[in-house]
Amino acid sequence: MRYLLLTFFTFHCQMVADALPRAKRLRLLREAKARKESGEGKIEEAGMIVTTGAPTPENETMEHNEVPQSTTDTDQKSEEIVEKIAQVQEEGANTEDESDEELLNLAPKRANWDMERDIAPMLRKLERRTQHAIVEILRTCDLKQ
């Protein structure tokens, strides 16, 4: 059972990793590294914020109705991240549309789906010439012998 769960988890993680293009992953890794160096925390690929370090005694004794400053900062950061993700998704949609247009421009102006039918008259003419050339070669060989 553990093997099955581990396999599923690994497969799921691989699918998530493949879903993001390489450039986006690299950009997210660079941002995470910069945040880690500055001590703010790190961002996972899913866009969730994970704080670094152990919980402090101040946070444990704080009352539930108080809102710590770090929570509001986290909320602002999460909103910024959501906006960035939405912007990246819009850019991705634009590039997909542009790539479809480029593929349509590469298509020939006149569709030649049935190549055999289009080339058949030329092939008949070429076959006829080939047969005449073979006959002439055989005649010249017979005359020499």
Swiss-Prot record:
Compartments, record wording: Secreted; Host nucleus
GO CC, any one term: U2-type spliceosomal complex
Pfam families found in the cross-reference section: cwf18
Signal sequence annotation: 1-19
Glycosylation-annotated residues: 59
Annotated motif RxLR, positions: 27-30
Keywords associated with the record: Glycoprotein, Host nucleus, Secreted, Signal, Virulence
Main location (coarse class): secreted
Annotated stretches, region: Disordered: 38-77
Keyword Ribosomal protein: no
Domain writeup: Has the canonical translocation RxLR motif, but lacks the canonical EER motif, which characterizes most oomycete effectors identified so far.
Stated family: Belongs to the RxLR effector family.
Function per UniProt: Secreted effector that dos not suppress the host cell death induced by cell death-inducing proteins.
Full protein name: Secreted RxLR effector protein 100
Organism: Plasmopara viticola
